[in-house]
Amino acid sequence: MYNYLDFEKPVADLEGQILELKKLAQEQGSVEMGDEISRLEKRSADALKDIYRKLTPWQKAQIARHPDRPHCLEYIDRLFTEFTPLAGDRKFANDEALQAGFGRFNGTPVAIIGQEKGSDTKTRLKHNFGSARPEGYRKAVRIMEMADRFQLPLITFVDTAGAYPGVSAEERGQAEAIARSTAECLKLRVPVISIIIGEGGSGGAIAIAVANRVYMLEHSIYSVISPEGAASILWHDSTRAKDAASNMRITAQDLFDLKIIDGIIPEPLGGAHRGKESVIDAAGDIIAASLRSMKDIDGETLKQERRQKFLEIGRNI
């Protein structure tokens, strides 16, 4: 059984009935329920198609936050070999919210940075729900500097509601760390590819997403603030997040139209959690194609194209 979202209730009800009938048929050794099971399976599939054909921005935000969605470490595990993580910022501590290291992609040495939310209570606490502290962004800068020094392409996976806003993080220079990471991205003379795999929230996301090629999964979101945060500012009422999401243009489709991202990676019907391996493989195909397209571009040109890309964003909106 999947973890169903509120708007998926019609599908949840049908799939619950299917499971009950299958269990009953198995217990009774009966094959007479086959037709009814097939009928319900068709109704369930049709209901899912109907729901996902007309998703609202707020519903997409819920899918982007789905607890079973594939996370950064799953992408790393499936797409890269010989992954060697690096820990710590050499100033204060190691931040588990931000994963970073080196590995091979299709045999090519690359640098990897990504935000990890965790998949259960224990790992979510360990990774601070994907909200990095200053030391996480300083660790990212370490990786970026080494990628530039050794001429390794940089691949980043973005999945965060935003950088950690706690007092301790602010005291250790959260704003400076985010700004430094963003600036370092702009200086790199290597190909940089960024994929928004879930939430891309605020400066915490952009700090590792200033890339030559930026892609989003079909049901991911990317914005300067969460819908709840925007609703709190605009109407002093976070419960109006649905209204905010409808006006913020946070979806992959909106951002592709605005030329903020370079492409959209399709998800299986029902979201990435219903076909993790296929989604991760599709992301791998995009990474491979992007690396091929930038293979013969010199470092200075890559740097200037990246800077120009982000300067153009304001002109296209």
UniProtKB/Swiss-Prot annotation:
Pathway terms, separated by semicolons: Lipid metabolism; malonyl-CoA biosynthesis; malonyl-CoA from acetyl-CoA: step 1/1
Alphabetized UniProt keyword annotations: ATP-binding, Cytoplasm, Fatty acid biosynthesis, Fatty acid metabolism, Lipid biosynthesis, Lipid metabolism, Nucleotide-binding, Transferase
Domain CoA carboxyltransferase C-terminal stretches: 40-293
GO biological process: fatty acid biosynthetic process; malonyl-CoA biosynthetic process
Catalytic activity as recorded in UniProt: N(6)-carboxybiotinyl-L-lysyl-[protein] + acetyl-CoA = N(6)-biotinyl-L-lysyl-[protein] + malonyl-CoA
Annotated localization: Cytoplasm
InterPro entries for the chain: Acetyl_CoA_COase_a_su, ClpP/crotonase-like_dom_sf, COA_CT_C
GO molecular function: acetyl-CoA carboxylase activity; ATP binding; carboxyl- or carbamoyltransferase activity
EC number(s) per entry: 2.1.3.15
GO cellular-component term (any): acetyl-CoA carboxylase complex
Function as written in the Swiss-Prot or TrEMBL entry: Component of the acetyl coenzyme A carboxylase (ACC) complex. First, biotin carboxylase catalyzes the carboxylation of biotin on its carrier protein (BCCP) and then the CO(2) group is transferred by the carboxyltransferase to acetyl-CoA to form malonyl-CoA.
Family: Belongs to the AccA family.
Subunit structure: Acetyl-CoA carboxylase is a heterohexamer composed of biotin carboxyl carrier protein (AccB), biotin carboxylase (AccC) and two subunits each of ACCase subunit alpha (AccA) and ACCase subunit beta (AccD).
Protein name per Swiss-Prot or TrEMBL: Acetyl-coenzyme A carboxylase carboxyl transferase subunit alpha
Species per Swiss-Prot/TrEMBL record: Brucella abortus (strain S19)
